[in-house]
From Swiss-Prot:
It is a single-pass type II membrane protein. The lineage of its organism: Eukaryota, Viridiplantae, Streptophyta, Embryophyta, Tracheophyta. GO terms for biological process: cell wall pectin biosynthetic process; fucose metabolic process; mannan metabolic process; mannosylation. Gene3D superfamilies: 3.40.50.11350. It comes from Arabidopsis thaliana (Mouse-ear cress). Keywords: Carbohydrate metabolism, Cell wall biogenesis/degradation, Fucose metabolism, Glycosyltransferase, Golgi apparatus, Membrane, Signal-anchor, Transferase, Transmembrane, Transmembrane helix. This is Protein MANNAN SYNTHESIS-RELATED 1.
Length: 422
């Protein structure tokens, strides 16, 4: 029986369309996971070519032949022109703590600043609490207190300590949904503040998704300032993290000093049980072997330098190192003189903020795990002009295009950060 050539061609086209649709759905799903939190047209230069970003879609322009995108420095903060210069009053105090790592700290700082600003209260610098009882640090152990106070001086009064005459025991604890709005503060928090005089704020996370929504309206410029213009590492921690970035670039001389950061942590992978989502080629998270195959099929060379957020080397990572020998965890690239303080501490806060710093500044970021670390790292990368975020997937073919796996946060410009940068 003869074969109709038109039917064969039509069949091939149909299969191709389903594969493309599966990849698109996967990337959207990875960004839209609604997880519960712990405890409560511009041009982007490619290597030797360009990628055009139009109407939220990313595609290669003729002549594209590289995997490394150049930084995009076109975006600038919108909030300086939108902030009011009204004097900061001081009717009482707002206290809070930073918990669960830097990806949560950003949101917790933002919520506390918003509450203090719209209540006309004085904000007290937070302490930093780890996952274990009694695991506490001063804010200044990790972050630059003077930078935060200076950045907020015309918005919110910030003090380093609560006056002795004010007791924490008498403060009302107010749970605040992350991305809290002025309207919510007026309706739910202001009455408590007026009654008690001082409050303690605790953020909770109904979702770890940071997509901007049409229902959100304009992002409050105070929130933009707090999220992207106030929180920096203190000088010593910053210097250690930057030295590690430079060491990774030294290992990457053949690729112009470029390297990939992969958020891959064995303990989290074991807890999440990386199950399939029902969408072709998509999962909730990816192990070392799957990340290695993903990067190899995209065409990254075997001498590509890769940084992993995994705290210490684990035998399950060997497959990744077999394919990409220049794969490192932090103990291999941290200066020897700093390891006792930053790697042998009971608390993991130093390691967490270093991971966030390196992941935000790498030439490519690959989130093996969907969650708030991914979402806030993308936000920081947008602020720094580093849009190279590749969402992993199981590539059924022998190879794939990196531009097919750009995070929708970037390709569709639907991350909250795009409301804060023009």
């Amino acid at each position: 029986m003869g074969v109709d050539l038109r039917q064969v061609v039509a069949g091939i086209l149909t299969i191709t369309m389903f594969v493309m649709l599966g990849q698109m759905l996967h990337r959207d799903y990875f960004d839209s996971l609604q997880e519960k939190a712990q405890g409560d047209a511009q041009d982007i230069e490619f290597e030797g070519s360009k990628v055009s970003v139009k109407d939220g879609l990313v595609g290669t322009v003729e002549g594209s032949k590289g995997l490394w995108m150049e930084d995009n420095t076109d975006l600038t903060p919108c909030w300086p022109t939108l902030l009011s210069d009204d004097a900061v009053s001081s009717k009482g105090y707002v206290t809070f703590s930073l918990t669960n790592g830097p990806e949560y700290h950003i949101s917790q700082i933002t919520d506390a600043v918003m509450v203090a600003k719209h209540l006309g209260a004085t904000l007290v610098l937070p302490d930093i609490r780890g996952s274990k009882p009694g695991d506490e640090r001063n804010f200044e152990d990790i972050y630059d207190a003077d930078k935060l106070i200076k950045s907020l001086e015309n918005v919110v009064k910030v003090v380093k300590k609560l006056p002795e005459e004010v007791s924490l025991r008498n403060m009302a604890i107010v749970k605040v949904p992350t991305r809290v709005t002025e309207d919510y503060i007026k309706e739910h928090i202001d009455p408590i503040f007026k009654s008690k005089g001082n409050i303690r704020v605790a953020s909770y996370f109904p979702s770890v998704n940071l997509r901007k929504s049409s229902q959100d309206g304009e992002t409050d410029p105070v929130a933009c300032l707090a999220m992207f213009g106030s929180l920096e590492l203190q000088p010593e921690v910053n210097a250690v993290a930057e030295s590690m970035v430079e060491r990774l670039r030294t290992h990457s001389r053949k690729s112009g000093g470029r390297f990939i950061a992969v958020d891959l942590r064995i303990d989290i992978l074991e807890k999440k049980n990386c199950h399939t989502t029902g969408v072709v080629g998509s999962k909730t998270c990816y192990n070392a072997q799957e990340i290695a195959l993903f990067l190899r099929k995209l065409g990254f060379a075997s001498d590509t330098t890769i940084y992993l957020t995994q705290p210490r080397w684990d035998s399950s990572l060997n497959i990744l190192k077999d394919i990409f020998p220049k794969t490192f965890t932090k103990e291999a690239i941290m200066p020897a003189s700093k390891r006792s303080k930053y790697l042998e501490s009971v608390s993991s806060e130093y390691e967490n903020v270093i991971d966030f710093y390196i992941s935000s500044r790498s030439d490519v970021f690959v989130p093996a795990i969907s969650g708030l670390f991914y979402a806030n790292t993308v936000g920081k990368r947008i602020a720094l002009g580093k849009p190279q975020v590749l969402v992993p997937a199981e590539i059924s073919e022998t190879s794939g295009l990196a531009t097919d796996f750009i995070s929708p946060y970037i390709s569709k410009k639907n991350h909250l950060a795009y409301s804060c940068f023009c």
